[in-house]
Amino acid sequence: MQLNVNDAQAIEVSELTFGGEFNETLVHQAVVAYMAGGRQGTKQQKTRSDVAGGGKRPWRQKGTGRARAGTTRGPIWRGGGVTFAARPQDHSQKLNKKMYRAALRSILAELVRSDRLVVVQDFAVEAPKTKDLLNKLNGMGLSDVLIVSDAVDQNLYLAARNLPHVDVRDVQGSDPVSLIAYEKVLITVSAVKKFEELLG
């Protein structure tokens, strides 16, 4: 199949990588797994056994008329532990490499189908100036955009850093969430070739 390039002639690309069916279930699974992997999972609360003190029983077992109590750190006591205390946990989900690659192929194909993939021969700025990048993007009619190149250009990265709806990634740093989060994905021809190598 052919992909139109903004400032040059169309290029031939793999049907497998850029022309497959959209598998919504697989893409959803990949997005959930990616976001779950980003969770810290470090919150922790104290149970009755973690709270300091409470070793001595507050009153004797019998003869007081009060309910029996063996510690002052039980969950029903002020200053006591939490009943079902949160514990650190690993939220990450396993996703096979084959499935992850298939999800990325599915996303790329859908971007092509929905005219959200803008292919250019090359994309760079001469100096790390946000204004220069903004003018360049405005000239192309792009405001909410992910810029993907085969290697991150330092000037481009610094210029885009302060723009809220613009992000710069290389092919290796692209993930399912970032690829679908933006209105348009601006990608260089070299990045297209690299995606074909990785996902073909």
UniProtKB/Swiss-Prot annotation:
Belongs to the universal ribosomal protein uL4 family. GO terms for cellular component: ribonucleoprotein complex; ribosome. Keywords: Ribonucleoprotein, Ribosomal protein, RNA-binding, rRNA-binding. The keyword Nuclease does not apply. This is Large ribosomal subunit protein uL4. The keyword rRNA-binding applies. InterPro entries: Ribosomal_uL4, Ribosomal_uL4-like, Ribosomal_uL4_dom_sf. One of its GO terms (biological process) is translation. GO terms for molecular function: rRNA binding; structural constituent of ribosome. HAMAP family: Ribosomal_uL4_B. Signal peptide: none annotated.
